[in-house]
Amino acid sequence: MTPSFLMLVLAFEWNSKVAYAAQLREAMKWLGEQEGTVFLGQAVAVPGTAMFNTLTDVPLEKVFELPVAEEMQMGMVNGLALEGFVPVSIFPRWNFLLLAMNQLINHLDKISIMSNNGFKTKVIIRTGVGSQRPL
């Protein structure tokens, strides 16, 4: 069974005594154990970055570093989702995600409609929010 947002929420009960980053790392580890899940984005394979630090328990063969090309990244996510993968698309900052809105709104959102429900894509989009140090 492939993971979905609901399954992710149900799998992890919030523990206020554990740091947010530790719980995020645990959630990414769980996703990394699921068949078909891949992680791609910017700064995901660069040690010392906030995004990398939450992926330390994810198998390296599931993590793909991409250049700064947000629309291309979301296009890859669309293709992977159409092939049955569950891509976790990681953007280091939310304002980088804005550059991928064409692929997100005009393509990913409409795949099910355009294929007459032939494709039901599953995608997880993750981004950091904060003024200096989001995590």
Language-model features, listed with the residues they occupy:
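Thiamine diphosphate
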Residues: 5-135
